[in-house]
């Protein structure tokens, strides 16, 4: 059941991301990734909101949490996960780990894009 919940949430989240990105490009143009920026900010807000609510005020089942957080928000943006994990490190007092996590995530992520692009360019 959990796999189905994640799949349903991911399908919804990915379609929301696509729709929002198309809308933003039509509204403001495609020269800047407005859609991705909007998705990442909304997703970061949503994961913080949902997970704090789920642990303080609501009683979500594991399946519901997986559908919303792992599926929907994971399909919408993985940036929200990075943001919430950074929040968790900071609020637990692990400032150095949070800084290292953010810098390494962005640094290695960007390096991965360049590496992947480089490998793709040299393929026959």
Curated annotation (Swiss-Prot):
Protein origin, superkingdom: Bacteria
GO biological process: cellular detoxification of fluoride
Organism: Roseiflexus sp. (strain RS-1)
Lineage of source species: Bacteria, Bacillati, Chloroflexota, Chloroflexia, Chloroflexales
Any GO MF annotation of the entry: metal ion binding
Family, similarity comment: Belongs to the fluoride channel Fluc/FEX (TC 1.A.43) family.
HAMAP family, per the entry: FluC (MF_00454)
Catalysed conversion reaction: fluoride(in) = fluoride(out)
GO cellular component, one term: plasma membrane
Residues at which Na(+) binds: 74, 77
Keywords noted in UniProt: Cell membrane, Ion channel, Ion transport, Membrane, Metal-binding, Sodium, Transmembrane, Transmembrane helix, Transport
Membrane-protein topology: Multi-pass membrane protein
Described function: Fluoride-specific ion channel. Important for reducing fluoride concentration in the cell, thus reducing its toxicity.
Xref: InterPro entries: FluC
Localization: Cell membrane
Transport among keywords: yes
Protein's name according to its UniProt entry: Fluoride-specific ion channel FluC
Gene this protein is translated from: fluC
Residue intervals passing through the bilayer: 3-23, 34-54, 66-86, 100-120
Regulation: Na(+) is not transported, but it plays an essential structural role and its presence is essential for fluoride channel function.
């Amino acid at each position: 059941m959990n796999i189905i919940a994640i799949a349903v949430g991911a399908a919804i989240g990915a379609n929301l991301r696509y729709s929002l990105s198309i809308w933003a490009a039509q509204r403001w143009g495609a020269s800047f990734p407005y859609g991705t920026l909007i998705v990442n900010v909304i997703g970061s807000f949503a994961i913080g909101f949902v997970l704090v609510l789920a642990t303080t005020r609501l009683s979500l089942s594991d399946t519901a949490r997986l559908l919303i957080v792992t599926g929907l928000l994971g399909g919408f943006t993985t940036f929200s996960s990075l943001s919430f994990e950074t929040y968790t490190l900071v609020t637990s007092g692990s400032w150095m780990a949070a800084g290292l996590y953010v810098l390494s995530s962005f640094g290695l992520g960007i390096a991965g894009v360049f590496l992947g692009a480089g490998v793709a360019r040299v393929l026959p």
